[in-house]
Amino acid sequence: MDSQRNILLIALALVSFLLFQQWNVAQNPAPQAVEQAQSGSTLPAPSYADDLDPAPGQVASAKTITVTTDVLTLSIDTVGGDVVTANLNDYSAEFDSEDTFVLLKNEPGHQFIAQSGLVGPQGIDLSSTNRPSYTVSADSFTLAEGQDELRIPMTYQANGLDYTKTFVLKRGSYAIDVEYDVVNNSGNNATFGMYAHLRQNVMDDGGSLTMPTYRGGAYSTEDTRYKKYSFDDMQDRNLSLNLANGQGWAAMIQHYFASAWIPRDEAGSNLYTRVIGNLGDIGVRMPNKTIATGDEASFKATLWVGPKLQDQMAAVAPNLDLVVDYGWLWFIAKPLHTLLSFIQGIVVNWGLAIICLTFIVRGAMYPLTKAQYTSMAKMRMLQPKLTAMRERIGDDRQRMSQEMMELYKKEKVNPLGGCLPILLQMPIFISLYWALMESVELRHSPFFGWITDLSAQDPYYILPLLMGASMFLIQKMSPTTVTDPMQQKIMTFMPVMFTFFFLFFPSGLVLYWLVSNIVTLIQQTLIYRALEKKGLHSK
């Protein structure tokens, strides 16, 4: 198999990969019963599921307070204590925009909020029309210079019970602790359980062919480290799983960003989903606690609302960092991302880091590349003998196959030697694709010149055109034995097809492919010179 056919193989693999990933994002089937059994024991739906917020609609916001830290700006509704707006201070809404990115919002036609409350026999959050109206000491709270932690207590009293709902935010963190403290002076026992869920409009946001994205639910249990549960899944079947030993979380994820509730109860919780109208919920329900009169009890959960930063998320909850979904080649993509981040810390530019990573990857793969070209050169040297063999043997395929294998063995040629290195390189490309696609660090990161955002396509298509030209040069430098007119036309058209595809790829990925092609040209020149000295190649 010569280099021209290898390029065809790469093209077919790339197109297949693009079509597969688009299908994989769109087709996210609900877990079967056996999967549910593996990920946690099935429990009845929470008792409050039918009467909590029975009617879809926008949450009433008679009064909200503003909470500001170095990385977050939140709006919290004093009715119920829901987080109804979350601005990420370090992330712009669009490239070169002064507006910050809004992850949680409560707007007509687009609701995405984080709700929490107390339910159970004496619950105070059993209905959307009857939730507690908390008292707060101020309308705004700001994490001051030199202050590492900000606590916002909200108080409510009813029927001899004192409730304090406290939000705890820390400097540099997107994790928010939500704590309930209940003091029972009612003269009777009181039973409560805490719930916390994310509510979002059911929507379809599949991205493009070259950059498909997922927007929907995801969860983790003790037995299932990470699993998506799309809005379609929620509409098909309500999920109800047991989170044993206090492990697990429920999340809503999208490209680059995620929100998640992590229960902080060692006794275990119930993970649930449901759809009400056009609103989808995914959340956790912690077990009830009975508080004797004169006693007090506390409930706690952590809300993550921010970018997909793997190190921080891993520190908040086990497996939460897996929302950075590298696909089935995660074991390759994750080390590549780690290496890329390490290089970026040295060169302080993500574009330069991609270039350095390309040289490292292609350097590590040089033995495979050399073996590939050497094998192809030997195969070309055998072409006259193979042609004569076909003329001598005719249509006897079995004899032809036997004599070909004897010839390969005699000449010490592996007929797959030119193909296998290419197949081994494809997982690297696919893994790097996901590493770049899932890296929020590359979002709106500039390179040089006209490349002002490595996560967006080249605005002037210069990199894709250069990439196509480099492919054309590789073709011209590669000897070929292809004589079939149709194959020749396909190979001639291949750089054009690749260029078209890469017009819509993020410029960071096109940069990798362009530099990889340049390295290929350099390696190709060096290998051909060495093969010429051995008589295996001629100009």
From Swiss-Prot:
Its main location: membrane. Pfam families: 60KD_IMP, YidC_periplas. It comes from the Bacteria. It is found in: Cell inner membrane. Residues 35-44 have a biased composition (Polar residues). GO terms for molecular function: membrane insertase activity. Required for the insertion and/or proper folding and/or complex formation of integral membrane proteins into the membrane. Involved in integration of membrane proteins that insert both dependently and independently of the Sec translocase complex, as well as at least some lipoproteins. Aids folding of multispanning membrane proteins. PANTHER family: CYTOCHROME C OXIDASE ASSEMBLY PROTEIN COX18, MITOCHONDRIAL (PTHR12428:SF65), OXA1 (PTHR12428). This is Membrane protein insertase YidC. The gene is yidC.
